[in-house]
Each structure stands twice: as C-alpha cells, then as structure tokens.
Amino acid sequence: MSSLPRFSQINPATIVAELDTILAQNRAELLLLLSEIISLDWNFIQKLDDLDDRLQHFWSPINHLHAVKQTAKLRLAYNECLAKISAYSSELSQNSRLYQAIKTLDNGDYRFNYAQKKCLHNELRDFHLGGIDLPKAKQKRYQVIQAQLAQ
C-alpha cells in the first residue's frame, strides 16, 4: 500500500463498483466478526477500525479529488457513492449486535488505558447519535433523513 494516494489512477467509471466491493467485504467481515465473538477484547475494536480504514483509504482520495478537480463523471460517481456510504454508516450505527458488543466491552472488567476508554465512549456516543435507541420505525425514518442529507 502506497503512503500517498494515486489520484491519476482514480477512474470515475469504476468508483461505484469498487465501493460496492469494499462495502460488501466490510459487511461480510463484520458478520464474521460478530459471529466469532468468544471473548471480547481490544482486538475486536482494532478489527472494526481496520474495516473503517479500508473504506477511508478508498474514499478519502476520491472525496479530495471531487473537491479540487471535479468532472461530470466524477460528480455522478461521487453522488451515487455518497448515498451508499450514508446507508452503510446508518446500518452500522443502528446495528444492535455491534452496539451490544461494544457496550459489553465498555461495561466489562477490562483494563483499558485512557485513550481506549475514550474510544469506547465515543463509539457508544455515535451509536446513540445514529439512532440505536429509536424504535425500528423511527430508525428507518432516520436512515431516510440521513440519505436525503447526503444528497
């Protein structure tokens, strides 16, 4: 993996398909991660971060390119991807199994350092801001609103 983005290799024609692949991989790995929980520890959070890093490594250069050197094709791909990323984000923030796993870590007898505790508290805060406490019907409405805001 290169340390700098290769902007010249970003192809608007393939961005949506590449994002779909990454989101599918992340969803599959999250399901596997949640199904394999035997004992929770900090490795669980690190694996979640790896999923986020994969998405950010892909999306950040595209987001930057969209801001500084926009073309019609890039704009179309970017807008289509925004809706998908928004849906994925809402899906994660309303995933009750993921929320419970992180809550269990936070409430457990683990000895985390300050940064780790802060990370857990921020994760739980983000779940609440993402609508985890809402009834299912209101969660769906929240997802619709988030999708509209992403447009």
Model-derived segments and spans:
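Zn2+-dependent metallopeptidase catalytic domains
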Residues: 1-151
